[in-house]
């Protein structure tokens, strides 16, 4: 994956890796080509022949190809796709990124409110925000340094509880930003944390949820990759862990979990965005997260795990590794997915598709959802692809943060109410 963007004022917690020169995406275009039976093979050939990056690769007919085209290839690309339908996602990707990354300044000690969600923020400001937010609700929450990334950055978490007290109820675990470029997931998981804390004893549904569950929110599962997207490469996906005897760093952390690790839903190529790692669970951050989940499970168990991603507007259930196998709890997973999608749509009209991961988006090996369900024995394990469906993709404008948070919270509240009701 190519690199992008420098934010001169970004503070980085720890710097142990070599500085990578930022790349300017000015003039790059992101173009969607819908595929069908008569053009999917040709679209695949064009991507290969021109050595183009993709945000979405069309593995079969009917899937969209979201293609990043550099200025030097635009003429050749447009000639090759002549006669095909296309949609322009970003006319100038560099301009879109500059608009997205106009971070609002944050002063530590500020009383967090809705204004935080009007902008994206630096990694260091996220740490300050989470500590400030927790500081307003000290009697029923804690800020946790859950462990360190490969480069030594803090993996932050908020732990929230209700009337029963700390560690007295089955846990809910939310993960965000396991894929570094999916910035909207950082903001949406923080929006839910803010809502669970600030609306407790004000909103009956939220109060019931917080009283019935021990809530753990990890907004930045992959801090090294996240920081890297803000200094060098806006479209970076993996962590930043070096790979022995390979020029390409990083593991796809959501292909590194030690369950059904090998298969067509991951790659053995260190330069692939879906590189599974050298061994199951060898990602530094995965070791941290597995240790945390096991520790949480040892209290009252884990009632639900949700791994938040973008983009695609999907809410999905196990399995990722197989398109034919189904867990015994499949019917319940499907029911809760529909409840989530219906309640979410009622807020802003945003449609979500639901279904098993492998059948709904693509096959995935070594993913968090399958691992949580089958190894940790989490009762309900789910994943989401947040806004949008491709109009802006990974570079989602900041004015969509609040509506994304509002609708995702509504879907989550409806789903958890259904879990409480049994």
Swiss-Prot record:
Residue ranges occupied by any Peptidase M14 domain in the UniProt entry: 119-419
Annotated residues that bind substrate are located at 179-182, 237, 254-255, 310-311
Task: From the UniProt annotation, give the residues forming the signal peptide.
Answer: 1-17
Q: Which residues form the active site?
A: 385 (proton donor/acceptor)
Query: Among the record's GO biological process terms, what is one?
Result: proteolysis
State which residues form the propeptide: 18-112
How does the cofactor attach, per the note? Binds 1 zinc ion per subunit.
Q: Which domain of life is it from?
A: Eukaryota
The record, for InterPro entries, names: M14A-like_propep (IPR036990), M14A_act_pep (IPR003146), Peptidase_M14 (IPR000834)
Instruction: Briefly state the protein's biological role.
Output: Extracellular metalloprotease that contributes to pathogenicity.
Kindly give the PANTHER family that the UniProt entry links to this protein. PROTEASE FAMILY M14 CARBOXYPEPTIDASE A,B, SLL0236 PROTEIN
Q: What is this protein called?
A: Probable metallocarboxypeptidase A
Native species of this protein?
A: Trichophyton verrucosum (strain HKI 0517)
Per the UniProt record, the lineage of the source organism begins with: Eukaryota, Fungi, Dikarya, Ascomycota, Pezizomycotina
Instruction: Give the encoding gene's name.
Output: MCPA
């Amino acid at each position: 994956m190519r690199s992008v963007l420098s934010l001169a004022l970004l503070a980085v917690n720890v710097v142990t890796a070599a500085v990578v020169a930022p790349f300017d995406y000015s003039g790059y275009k992101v173009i969607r080509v819908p595929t069908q039976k008569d053009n999917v093979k040709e679209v695949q050939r064009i991507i290969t022949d021109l050595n183009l990056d993709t945000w979405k690769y069309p593995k079969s007919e009917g899937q969209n190809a979201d293609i990043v085209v550099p200025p030097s290839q635009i003429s050749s690309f447009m000639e090759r796709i002549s006669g095909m339908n296309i949609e322009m996602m970003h006319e100038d990707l560099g301009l879109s990124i500059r608009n997205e990354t106009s971070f609002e300044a944050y002063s530590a000690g500020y009383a967090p409110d809705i204004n935080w969600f009007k902008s994206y923020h630096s990694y260091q400001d996220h740490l300050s925000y989470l500590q400030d937010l927790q500081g307003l609700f000290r009697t029923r929450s804690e800020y946790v340094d859950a462990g360190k990334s490969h480069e030594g950055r803090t993996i932050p978490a908020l732990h929230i509880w209700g009337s029963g007290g700390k560690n007295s109820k089955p846990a809910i675990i939310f993960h965000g930003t396991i894929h570094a470029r999916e910035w909207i997931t950082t903001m949406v998981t923080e929006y839910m944390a803010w809502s669970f804390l600030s609306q407790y004893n004000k909103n009956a549904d939220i109060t019931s949820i917080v009283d019935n569950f021990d809530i753990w929110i990890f907004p930045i599962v992959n801090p090294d990759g996240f920081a890297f997207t803000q200094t060098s490469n806006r479209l970076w996906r993996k962590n930043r862990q070096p790979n022995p005897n390979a020029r390409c760093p990083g593991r796809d952390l959501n292909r590194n979990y030690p369950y059904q690790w090998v298969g067509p839903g991951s790659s053995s190529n260190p330069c692939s965005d879906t590189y599974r790692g050298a061994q199951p669970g060898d990602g530094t951050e995965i070791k941290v997260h597995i240790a945390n989940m096991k520790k949480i499970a040892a209290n009252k168990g884990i009632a639900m795990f949700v791994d938040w991603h973008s983009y695609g507007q999907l809410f999905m259930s196990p399995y990722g590794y197989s398109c034919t196998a189904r867990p015994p709890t499949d019917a319940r997973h499907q029911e809760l997915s529909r409840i989530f999608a219906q309640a979410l749509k009622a807020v802003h009209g945003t449609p979500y598709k639901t279904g098993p991961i492998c059948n709904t988006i693509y096959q995935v090996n070594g993913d968090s959802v399958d691992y949580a369900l089958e190894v940790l024995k989490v009762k309900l394990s789910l994943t989401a692809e947040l806004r949008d469906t491709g109009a802006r993709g990974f570079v989602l404008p900041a004015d969509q943060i609040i509506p994304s948070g509002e609708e995702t919270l509504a879907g989550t509240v409806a789903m958890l109410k259904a879990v409480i009701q049994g």
